[in-house]
Amino acid sequence: KNGKVFFSTHKGYNEISNSKKCVDNRTRFNRAVNFAKAVNSLPELREIWKYSNIEGRSAYTKIMSYNMKLFHDTNPARTNKISPPGFGFHADNFIITNNSISVDVKLVQNFKELRNIKFTANFVVALSERKPDMEEFSFPYAVAVSEYTPVLDSEYQNVTAVFNTFERDNVEAYTKAMVFIAFTNIERKPYIHSSSLARGMDIIQT
């Protein structure tokens, strides 16, 4: 005004609600972020999500947008997915120890087209119920990979993945796990991948 510059200030109000609904929403969002980080840390899963038709600008945002609504309360559930929809398979006899994950798998469709293709078995483990005497970890997830080549159309094949030292130390701090598994092959386009399955279980300490 009249060649002069005036500044006005006012006190801002940005109160954060502590209602149960708002707290749960924030907790769910933070846990969805951790879930997406864990899935996105596996290179083949990241590549599969990146080129999927799921809404989002990157693999990470696609994982987030797809999974946010699937969380049960504030925790990952069996309905959450570490891969977009793909070919189906059966999984049985899940076993997780502080050293490894083991599961028996069998394809349920497109067997002839998928036989003898070498897949990467991707495991993402959501950890819960930390032992009271163990240091709290800020990232309660572990990941592991292995190989799987379907050769039998009527029998289960065992797939086992071993944790590295960092993942093993993390798993040892918890007593329960939700194990997610999905298969990927990105050697040539179009990429081939399965849907994902999950099971909740106790961790066997060895």
Protein language model annotation of sequence segments:
Residues K1-H90:
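Long, polar/Ser/Thr-enriched low-complexity segments
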Residues S52-T206:
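Charged linear interaction tracts used for macromolecular binding and regulation
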